[in-house]
Amino acid sequence: MLDFIKGEIVELIPDSVIIETGNIGYMLFISLNTYFSLTKIKSCKLYIYEVIREETHQLFGFIDKKERQLFTHLISVPGVGANIARMVLSSLSVCELEEIIFSGNVSALQALKGIGNKTAERIIIDLKDKVKPDNIPSSDTIITNISSNITKEAITALITLGFSQSASQKVVNKIVSNNSSSTTIEQIIKKALKLL
C-alpha cells in the first residue's frame, strides 16, 4: 500500500495531477482544495489513497493527512463513492466539512451536488463521532478585483469536473455579477458547485 508520493508536478488540472518520481508519471485524482494548494509550486508531496478493483486502479492524492482521513471517512458511508467524496472535498474546506458534520447541518450537505437528504443524514450519523473540528473555518485570502482570467479559469475548472460549458458559464457569470465585493477563484468554484 502506498502512503505518499513526492516528486515534480508534470501536469496539473483541477481534477487531477501527474507527478513524476523515479522516471514514472503517476496520475492522481485530487480535490479542488488540493489543486489550489499546488498551483504555485513545481514539486510536492501528496498523501495517497488507492482504489483497486477488478476493472480499475485509481490513485487519489491529498495535500495533507487530514484531507485523506476525511476522504476515507466519507467513502465508508453507504452511498458515497470516491467521486462524491472528492466533490464534497472540492466544495468545502476540511474545516468547513468538519464543522458541518459536527453541528449536524444536513441542509449544508444537501446543497452539494450528488448529496440527497438520506445521504446527507447518513454522512452526519456515521461520521459525527469520528470528526471533531479543530477550529472555526477562516476566511479565504481576498483578491481585490475579479478579472476575466479568474472567470475563465473557474469555468475551465468546472468543465474539467464534468459540467457542461453553458451551465458553467451561466453559473460563474451569475456569481460574479451578484458579487459586489471581491472574491477568489476558489470561492467562485465552491459557490458554483453548490448551484450546479
Curated annotation (Swiss-Prot):
Domain of life, source organism: Bacteria
Region annotation Domain II: where it falls in the sequence: 64-142
MF-aspect GO terms: ATP binding; four-way junction DNA binding; four-way junction helicase activity
Region described as Flexible linker: 143-146
GO cellular component: cytoplasm; Holliday junction helicase complex; Holliday junction resolvase complex
Region (Domain I): 1-63
Residue ranges of the region described as Domain III: 146-196
Pfam families attached to this UniProt entry: HHH_5, RuvA_C, RuvA_N
Annotated compartments: Cytoplasm
Record carries keyword DNA repair: yes
UniProt keyword annotations, A-Z: Cytoplasm, DNA damage, DNA recombination, DNA repair, DNA-binding
Xref: SUPFAM superfamilies: DNA helicase RuvA subunit, C-terminal domain, Nucleic acid-binding proteins, RuvA domain 2-like
Main subcellular location of this protein, as a coarse class: cytoplasm
InterPro entries, sorted: DNA_helicase_Holl-junc_RuvA_I, Hlx-hairpin-Hlx_DNA-bd_motif, NA-bd_OB-fold, RuvA, RuvA_2-like, RuvA_C, RuvA_C_sf
GO biological process, one term: DNA recombination
Record note on domains: Has three domains with a flexible linker between the domains II and III and assumes an 'L' shape. Domain III is highly mobile and contacts RuvB.
Family label: Belongs to the RuvA family.
Function: The RuvA-RuvB-RuvC complex processes Holliday junction (HJ) DNA during genetic recombination and DNA repair, while the RuvA-RuvB complex plays an important role in the rescue of blocked DNA replication forks via replication fork reversal (RFR). RuvA specifically binds to HJ cruciform DNA, conferring on it an open structure. The RuvB hexamer acts as an ATP-dependent pump, pulling dsDNA into and through the RuvAB complex. HJ branch migration allows RuvC to scan DNA until it finds its consensus sequence, where it cleaves and resolves the cruciform DNA.
Record's subunit section: Homotetramer. Forms an RuvA(8)-RuvB(12)-Holliday junction (HJ) complex. HJ DNA is sandwiched between 2 RuvA tetramers; dsDNA enters through RuvA and exits via RuvB. An RuvB hexamer assembles on each DNA strand where it exits the tetramer. Each RuvB hexamer is contacted by two RuvA subunits (via domain III) on 2 adjacent RuvB subunits; this complex drives branch migration. In the full resolvosome a probable DNA-RuvA(4)-RuvB(12)-RuvC(2) complex forms which resolves the HJ.
HAMAP family assigned: DNA_HJ_migration_RuvA
Protein name, entry field: Holliday junction branch migration complex subunit RuvA
